């Protein structure tokens, strides 16, 4: 089965395994988030959005995936390779609310990140251009 990832929104999960936010130096960004389980993920964030709209930051419109290479950003040295599992899902909507999510495919992924002080959003550390993610 083939999927056109360029037509699919891409999200990440912050804190998807215990201790990751601390290891990555990002725990301070989520200190005000409370969950029933202190080890639970803290947020969902956008990485890529294939919708052209003036209110969407330009970097979110850049398709980040490449199956052959990662292109490191210029003048950035603090990169962290993050092996992940990418999941393709069908999302069932009821008006403007998600009613259900059905996983339909998965693949190994390299969620390479820039550890960048001063970034206002985690998504700024995730999508810095074409070929910034492996799949």
Q: Where are the predicted features?
A:
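Basic/polar N-terminal segments that are highly enriched at the extreme N-terminus
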Residues: 1-2
